[in-house]
Amino acid sequence: MAPGCCTTRPRPIALLAHIWRHCKPLCLLLVLLLLCETVQANPDAKRLYDDLLSNYNRLIRPVSNNTDTVLVKLGLRLSQLIDLNLKDQILTTNVWLEHEWQDHKFKWDPSEYGGVTELYVPSEHIWLPDIVLYNNADGEYVVTTMTKAILHYTGKVVWTPPAIFKSSCEIDVRYFPFDQQTCFMKFGSWTYDGDQIDLKHISQKNDKDNKVEIGIDLREYYPSVEWDILGVPAERHEKYYPCCAEPYPDIFFNITLRRKTLFYTVNLIIPCVGISYLSVLVFYLPADSGEKIALCISILLSQTMFFLLISEIIPSTSLALPLLGKYLLFTMLLVGLSVVITIIILNIHYRKPSTHKMRPWIRSFFIKRLPKLLLMRVPKDLLRDLAANKINYGLKFSKTKFGQALMDEMQMNSGGSSPDSLRRMQGRVGAGGCNGMHVTTATNRFSGLVGALGGGLSTLSGYNGLPSVLSGLDDSLSDVAARKKYPFELEKAIHNVMFIQHHMQRQDEFNAEDQDWGFVAMVMDRLFLWLFMIASLVGTFVILGEAPSLYDDTKAIDVQLSDVAKQIYNLTEKKN
């Protein structure tokens, strides 16, 4: 570019800033003119507003005659059910409170005011009925958001302010968490009696019928995730107070709610039922594991934790016990009983014959009869005949190496006895008797065996607290010695053989009875397993089945009457 021609083009932003600096007063003046033009665009409404409120006194009741009654129509539009606090017994709702009444000072001819039929005025500038929530639980009895009121040329005034009310609600916890609650909101005039202000529901058709079935408008209701609305009736009452002779009318808006139980079923019911059935498995756990009592105590502590959790949810009332609380008390009783029974079973399992002798009826009932009813297989060695076992024990002993050697020696010294006599002799040896044994002398081959057995008789006779087996044998041996002269070594050997036989017999009986006690404990475990399982099933269905809502098929009306709910469910169906 040639020298002297170095002009630059202004940037767009800089150009706008330059125009704004020089034209700012002009722009502000233009905006003011537009606003003035807008205000002057409806001079009829301004003139009407001045005419209606210039001489209006908002403190005076709007009647032409002092004896007249102002009829106030009251309605409630529910927007949201925010919360129902069971602990504090407070219902929190987001509502629109609809008011309608006639004010003769607000009548005009629309033709005189350019066809204006409605006028919106601040509610602070007109008379308002002092409608309050009687059962308020938060301190705010009246509407705090002062929205504009709508004036009709006929004199009708419509005022619909929004409000969040916290009303007291008496909670019935008998069937928690399958419960239904009925709450109400009582509205009435705080100052004026029934001769000055008469209340009527906005949907009430005649004066005789004071009850309206659909008393709350649910068209703008947003469905709750915890409660279903079953009914919203409204009813007009008149109450006489001690202070005044005139009646005070009020309107009750009732809300019947049914709890959606999915949350509590998943987080409370199923864990409680599962933990209660663990008490049945205590009796399936073997007694030798050493964990039966620990499992019982763990289950008891778990149920105590759930009981404390419920006490934090429900109100502190002594009028009724909640359904879930009944079930927890029932299961805690079962678990506590299982602890006691488990201790008894463990005591039976570890009993010893030296301290506890099993009675015949215990053996007959718990070993022979009850296992068949419980479909248990009884080991064959537990069904033995103890008397036959004692008789045959000598024959078993004679078949051992030592017993056979003793019998051979007796046969040699008896001069070749017959087989029948030998069998009789074996039986007598097994039974502990020595009478009638025709033994003449002992040989040198038996002397070593006798010497081996001759020493420890005195020490073994009192082993394990068993009675001496030698009592009664001295007389029989003396009789034998009187008839036949036996060597002293053979007599001593017979004494020791009899002791060993009786000691082994008592030891086997000791072990067998120890096994019997263990099997009795096992049978008791199986018996109480079935009893506790049946009790748990019956208790679960009986206690939890008391709730009437489980059999109530009433459909919720909030989904049917709410336009918002219909839109939500329609969108959900389209997405699916």
Curated annotation (Swiss-Prot):
CNS in embryos. Residues 22-261 are extracellular. Keywords: Cell membrane, Disulfide bond, Glycoprotein, Ion channel, Ion transport, Ligand-gated ion channel, Membrane, Postsynaptic cell membrane, Receptor, Signal, Synapse, Transmembrane, Transmembrane helix, Transport. It is a multi-pass membrane protein. CDD domains: LGIC_ECD_nAChR_proto_alpha-like, LGIC_TM_nAChR. Disulfide bonds join 169-183, 243-244. Pfam families: Neur_chan_LBD, Neur_chan_memb. GO terms for biological process: chemical synaptic transmission; monoatomic cation transmembrane transport; monoatomic ion transmembrane transport; regulation of membrane potential; synaptic transmission, cholinergic. Residues 1-21 form the signal peptide. Residues 347-526 are cytoplasmic. The chain crosses the membrane at residues 262-285, 293-311, 327-346, 527-545. It comes from the Eukaryota. Glycans are attached at residues 65, 254, 570. GO terms for cellular component: acetylcholine-gated channel complex; neuron projection; plasma membrane; postsynaptic membrane; synapse. Its main location: membrane. GO terms for molecular function: acetylcholine-gated monoatomic cation-selective channel activity; excitatory extracellular ligand-gated monoatomic ion channel activity; transmembrane signaling receptor activity; transmitter-gated monoatomic ion channel activity involved in regulation of postsynaptic membrane potential. It is found in: Postsynaptic cell membrane; Cell membrane. Belongs to the ligand-gated ion channel (TC 1.A.9) family. Acetylcholine receptor (TC 1.A.9.1) subfamily. After binding acetylcholine, the AChR responds by an extensive change in conformation that affects all subunits and leads to opening of an ion-conducting channel across the plasma membrane. This is Acetylcholine receptor subunit alpha-like 2. It comes from Drosophila melanogaster (Fruit fly).
